[in-house]
Each structure stands twice: as structure tokens, then as C-alpha cells.
Amino acid sequence: AFHEGNASMKPLLGGKGAHLAEMTSIGLPIPSGFTITTEACREYLASHVLSDALWAEIRSAMDQLEQREQKRFGDPDNPLLVSVRSGAVTSMPGMMDTILNLGLNDRTVEGLARLTGNERFAYDCYRRFIQMFGDVVLHIPHALFEKHLETVKREEGAASDRELSAAGLKRVAAASLKTVKE
């Protein structure tokens, strides 16, 4: 958890992780979270396997996060959404990958819509998650997802993403999910 580190731990936590830990330790209001260490990353990059011990640590950190946030990862009624952000010891703006809204799926997006009272917001988050996951994890060309977005914008006569309806964003999410599954 962020409260377990501080700014001096950049080599272990990366710059982002160390700064989040420091902000937590001085009491700034930041979202709850945890950092997977650079050591764990190196181990994974060397073996391409997440060890049982690391899985157990991640599960424990997620359990603690669920308790703090009073939400559950994968719960269709009260979903916990997390962001996965890569980091480095030195700042490299725009060079590191991010996946937002991890935890959304066809069931949890409906729960998010109910919780927020905003179906459009929920489906915008979902389509963005699918796009980021496809791009960052599966290396699907970004242009394929943009094509779905542009098609629906044209169908709805929308000049920008913000003008799309909830139904339009549902169609973008469905088309994007189909691209990922293919």
C-alpha cells in the first residue's frame, strides 16, 4: 500500500510510486492504491512468469484496497476499478503505459451506471478501458479502436467524443470488444 513507502524509495517503487507513497505519508488526499516494485517487474521480465509469492502479495494488496474502498473487484453491484500505471525512477511523460478502469466488463459497467446514475459515463469508461487494454496489453493498433469511435460519431452526427450518446458509446464498446476478441 502507498502508506508503506516514501519519496526516498524511487529505485524500488519508481518515481510515481515513491511520490504517491510520500503524498500518502504526509496526509494528502490521494486515491488508495499499491505499487508493484521494480524488483518484481525485473523478475517478471526475466522469467515471463508471476511467481506464486507475487500473486499472493497482489491478492493481499487488492483485498486491503477492497476493504479501504468498500468495493469489490468484479462485483457487478459495487465494482472496484483500478488504474495500472507504469513508472520509472526518472520521469518520462508520455512514454509510459497506462490502463484505466481495470475491473470493467459487461456486468460491472451496468453496476457503475447504476451507482453513478450516468450510463453515458459508465460506457465511456468501458470503451476507454477496452481500447487501452487492447493497445497496451494486446498490441492491437490504436487506429482500429479509433475507427469504431469515428464510425459512431458519424452515425450520430457528433463532432466530438463528448457529444456521443450512451447508446453510441455502448456500440463503440461492443465493436471494440469484438476487435479484442478477434
Regions found by a protein language model. Give the residues of each.
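Nucleotide/phosphate-binding sheet-loop regions of phosphoryl- and nucleotidyl-transfer enzymes
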Residues: 1-182
